[in-house]
Amino acid sequence: EDIAFGPMNLGLSYDEVEKRVEDALKMVGMENYEDKTPHHLSGGQQKRIAIAGIIAMKPELMILDEPTAGLDPDGVEKVLNIMNQLNEEGMTLIISSHDIDMISKYADKIFVLYNGEIIESGNKNKIFSDMELLKKAHLRTPITTEILYNLKESGLNVNTEKISVKDTCAEIIKAKQINE
């Protein structure tokens, strides 16, 4: 019922609404929960049902506020997989989050807000390698950035704009080989 609410208000046929609800539930891995009431679901299941309600509307854009907040690791992984699949299918996602690890993995472009104002925008390497900016915005520095800054302060010539673990490891190996 909750998932069908939006599509029904679009004036779609009963069959189209049913198909959209079925497809949305399947996408979020909740196809056997169509008759459950929300208060009988876990927090992660409730989030996935809420996302299914949006998916059933077939929007071009989805705005999510802290989509992984309060979820256990399994719930986080499920929600991130759904978001990734939606993005791969062409949906634009706007995510508001303090989860630096999630944002550094999934975001293409980042806007940093402070006191309601955009104070910086750019790609994740630019944003997450700027420790002063992160401090000003009260955001946690990614562990990879901290490692690279510590190595740089120790005298290693490393590029602090590497964010992924894979790129950070490659940068450390490269710097170690140069210093040998």
Give short role names for the model-derived ranges.
Residues 58:
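Conserved catalytic motifs of ABC-family nucleotide-binding domains
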Residues 37-41, 45:
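Conserved ABC ATPase signature
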Residues 97-98:
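H-loop/switch region of ABC-family ATPase nucleotide-binding domains
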Residues 62-65:
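Catalytic Walker B motif of ABC-type/P-loop ATPase nucleotide-binding domains
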Residues 8, 15-32:
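Conserved ABC ATPase "signature" region
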Residues 121-122:
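ABC ATPase "signature
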